[in-house]
């Protein structure tokens, strides 16, 4: 009974960290709207928060795996949280710089540094959370089921982030980084609280193999893992790209109030929440391969419909005027709702891909998790590519980037994920 209680305590902590990752990471998308309007800059430059946050994964991915191998999951989580506290504090400071219009370069530079440091934290925590949930669940379908359960709370935190930021921004054309202070303070408080709780909690951990270059080579020698790492690289372009450019399109091109846009984009993450509930309930019965095959096909269908749906067919959607606390109805193109439904599909992609990619890796699992996290920097690359396409030919046509990513995930599920060899 004692061991069981300890295990559940570890599960609860890992799930709480999963939620924190979503809240802090998703601050970057509404912040991009603020930055674009405050600086009157292009879509490519407006994504500096996402670039900083996700490029950090490239730098920290493998070192994070090494930290786990050397110090264990608990100490590594504490290191990550300490770094996160610093990153959030720097982002907050960027909004406190006087005369932001005259010092725009300084404001954006400080914010970028803060986002980059916060990205270190997100990378480290991801390296801790995913393998620990997989291990605590017993691996296989059961491990995937526990990852999907953690994903439910991850999506809930994302929904809260967008609704909160929609309320804080109000009028996107006049918003400043300092308007996001309450959200940043919430994130800072959560980090501090989590640090204290984890420091006081005993977590039983599996033994880790010493980190050697041969371990990295050993993990990459597994074809299904190498292709899975690329799948995560491209998957990030779907998960973040779809809601990000819905927000930019509705705010910057259609001029829909930020309060309504925040509610709309929150629907995407609410769809992820629903999908993860479903994924958690059937994860022990349905294989990851079947899940990813199904949702990849659905993503292709939904994104293509969203791109080609007539823009003059409108659907009324309720938003909130947070100044007067009244409901405001806004006409939105029907294709936007197809994009939002993609959240149902992305809800199970991360856990499913991770589960397939680390299957049979044995002693290479810890370092493989670090390599996996490194590939999350694909979000920065895919955001840059999609933003460039959006600047060149428009927001809607930029979704061809998402179509390409979804097509690769379908290939990985059907062909690339098959395990050719197993380790003890």
Write out the residue ranges for each language-model feature.
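Extracytoplasmic gate region of multi-pass secondary transporters
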Residues: 28-32, 221-266, 274
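Central cavity-lining transmembrane alpha-helices of secondary-active solute carriers
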Residues: 48-68, 266-278, 378-381
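Extracytoplasmic
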Residues: 9-41, 126-130, 242-250
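Helix-loop-helix hairpin linking two adjacent transmembrane segments in secondary transporters
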Residues: 130, 143-201
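Helix-to-loop junctions at the C-terminal end of transmembrane segments
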Residues: 60-75, 275-288, 313-314, 390
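C-terminal ends and interior cores of transmembrane alpha-helices
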Residues: 82-104, 298-328
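Intracellular juxtamembrane helix-capping segments at the cytosolic ends
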Residues: 124-138, 346-362
